[in-house]
Amino acid sequence: MPEYLKMEKQDLINEFEAVRKEYEALRSLHLSLDMSRGKPGFDNMDLSEKMFDLVGNDTGFKNIDGIDCRNYGGLDGLIEMKNLFAEILELNPEQIIVGGNSSLNMMFDTIAQAMTHGMGGAPWYECKERKFLCPVPGYDRHFAIAQYFGFKLIPIAMNAEGPDMDAIEEWIKDETVKGIWCVPKYSNPNGITYSDAVVKRMAALKPAARDFRIFWDDAYAVHHLYDTKDELLNIYDECVKCGNPDLPIIFTSSSKITFPGAGVAAQAASPNNVSMLKGRMQYQTIGPDKLNQLRHARMFRNIQDVEKHMKKLADKLRPKFDAVLFELDIQLKGLGVASWTKPNGGYFISLDVLEGCAKRVTELCANAGMTLTPAGATYPYGIDPKDSNIRIAPSFPSVDEITKAAKVLCVAVKYAALEKIINN
């Protein structure tokens, strides 16, 4: 099949009629498919069920320090979990704060604290024109937090190495720019891992705002899909080399390692930032869920245990990614109306369709019984200026369901592209 944009009008009409019939046939199946969020499938979560047997009357409730995890206390988490997250993030345990089940919650709280009490400076609410840098396409819930707190969201284009550092270095000359969101490894949604050059330039930033912070969400630190594993330079070490130890606030969690609703989250930072954050936390909580932390600590004694577990998860997840990529290659390659990422890890595939077609594609999919992340969600304010990006989340459905969903998606992409080309 030649590229659609190079075809004669009548050939396009004929192709559209064939695609329309294929689409109507799929609609008649009354499918109910969901690729809207990066939720682990039941098969992935089942691999962690054994942890519920690791804490109880038979196994005891005390950690290695003799702390009874049923009781109050332990503001910044159990030492076992600090050690584990320190291994994952390649930091010192003293730099780790272990929280509840949600790293997003910790991000929200950190910004809320900065709004009222500053981040080593004046409270952020005093800056009326405050701005936050948002690499795009990116994570909608990051953008939503900054928007909730009244920041103007500044899109920063992503490229093959990470965010556009030239643009970032220009924007941080403005002292009203207070931070940047980063998903540096297997980024959401395009699966890019920041290059060494990008990490080094990020660490060397000299913002006009001394309270500028890098919100480094290392959500997919150990989430490899294939034997080819991306490597990410240590942002904290690089910041220390550049005299910027306080610049990054690092987040991660076990949400997509064990249970999204009952994992363990952590944040990490310089000793100065950790002291500041813990000083504020003491007014917020007496401590996190230590029993859940103990369950995780007993299941994962070290990074090697995590890596073995993640290989099992990858074995479950990989066929789902492969099924989507296979359909994209078979149905859309060479048509000139779509491009997509082939990530080595993470939870998403980023699909770019013909400009002006993303909303129509998601509409067509919805009408055929398939739910996708809303078009535009990967951009601030839900507005994709090109209306072209769609985030694909293959993790939750079964391989059979994923294959059906990918077929619907590909037909919808062709339908929307032909419709637009013919009408123009």
Where are these regions (language model features)?
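Conserved core of the PLP fold type I
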Residues: 67-210, 221-243, 408-410, 414-423
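Conserved glycine-rich beta-strand-loop-beta hairpin in the small C-terminal domain of fold type I
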Residues: 311-325, 337-352, 366
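Conserved PLP-binding active-site segment of the aspartate aminotransferase-like
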Residues: 350-355, 372-414
